[in-house]
């Protein structure tokens, strides 16, 4: 990082790129204070800010590696910047400051990606993105009926920026990355052509910069900084993880699915803990131990599945329901977060209340990791689980570490991931047991081995359907999350919105070219088509699992590459074709490693797919073998069972890819 004083200010550059430019006429820093209103209803937040002061810190005094900022000469200094390697450390010199704004130099044709896992817009330029972990919303588009109904019935419609996994990090087409080290509510605003504005509801510890000669170099550096995941477990490559929550009937249904030729790696039964019925649908009983009524002799069943090479997976989240046996155990030990009166804080999760296990209390975190993850899950025979939630930390509770819950809210998903990882490590199962999360924040990369895209609607909608999963994979992948996957067929079914056979098949086609194939019955299984209820759907699903398994050698090579370099399995086109700006905003197709390009069909009724093939070499259409020159737009036929997939003609894996055509 290069710091240079100017006539009346300073500039900061990294890799010959000016990132910050400060002068009295165009200040880069603003400070002040505000009063926020934050209301949470079942994980959905209504947030407003009343800004009382926003003052430009126009005057800079430079002394060695530090800069002191004030509003004008002779005024009291309010902020100190200290240069530290490729970071700027910030110190508030005025205790009243609880709002900071920073303007980063921008170019008009610049593209910006990141922000954690973004589901609607991969290229964030031109929009404003609040960064606060929450439910992402149902519909996520204020122009749609489902979003409107979700807002009216449960304040749950959401918007384009809502995400389970925000992160104050971006990658710029100027070949640098920026990270704000804070857990406070923050906003990335990319609406101005001359600058990017960062808003933070605290003075952050530091702002870090990363630069490289290529996008891949920067992504690799980010992954090293935040932490890398181990390679995928070998058992995953055996086929799909079948999600069923049908009690003991799940085993018979699995046999039917396998009899159709489906390649299966695991049976995932969320309801291993039992069910409760709510107006939303069938919900789980949030007490994390095997339910003998729902699954009698489950330990024996798990052993029988293991003999057939099939793993068993379950479900857990960081809360305990008040009517379960684990709740009084945790409460008597003082493991729950408390309210203002010092009593256990209860959170409404939709017609039932839960306590929040306080992971800032080391004893509580250790108890959860050992007693629940260790004994109740791993020792019982589970090989993996959905580690759900993490976004619901109320902002008015009291925590063991004494830190304001508003500052711990964003940090909670990473603490949750750490508890899971600690339990896995305690049994020597790191890289063998596979848990997956939807919630995330800075540092989750070091603990969570697999991201899943959260709760999509069971449809083809632009902001909450199949296509959003691609955007989520690409954005989170740039942040150092190598592995991403989704619920095949989506999850959320409300207001008469139900799955079609076409949706399941198109989602399956995409999933076959992702790190993990996993089905989900959804929130209302009885209202929605399942893979074993339609012969055509099941036959299609079985074939796509065979393709996934046949691709395993290639996927293993990508997993090894991810562990070594941090590059994600699913990559934006520009990662390998950075000199082709037309790839910068592409978010509905992806590179599967460097050698494959996947363009899923994401609109209902479509049997053709138009896409851009990058580069100067030739691409081979996977199903027909026809060659296409790179560097141009093409349209191909995409009947069911043949998504638009291409591979590089000069790939060292070309023989493996050619064999996929023979799978009937």
Curated annotation (Swiss-Prot):
Hydrolase among keywords: yes
State its role: Part of the sulfoquinovose monooxygenase (sulfo-SMO) pathway, a D-sulfoquinovose degradation pathway that enables the complete utilization of all carbons within sulfoquinovose (SQ) with concomitant production of inorganic sulfite. Catalyzes the first step of the pathway, the hydrolysis of sulfoquinovosyl glycerol (SQGro) to release sulfoquinovose (SQ). Hydrolyzes both epimers of SQGro, with a preference for the natural 2'R isomer.
Tell me what turns on expression of this protein.
Induced during growth on sulfoquinovose.
A biological process term (GO) from this entry: carbohydrate metabolic process
Q: Does the keyword Manganese apply?
A: no
Q: Which reaction(s) does the protein catalyse, per the Swiss-Prot or TrEMBL entry?
A: 3-(6-sulfo-alpha-D-quinovosyl)glycerol + H2O = 6-sulfo-alpha-D-quinovose + glycerol
Please name the gene that encodes this protein. Answer: smoI
Recorded protein name is Sulfoquinovosidase
Family to which this protein belongs:
Belongs to the glycosyl hydrolase 31 family.
Q: How does activity depend on pH?
A: Optimum pH is 8.0.
Entry note about domains: Structural analysis revealed the molecular coevolution of catalytically important amino acid pairs directly involved in substrate recognition, as well as structurally important pairs distal to the active site.
Q: Where is the signal peptide?
A: none
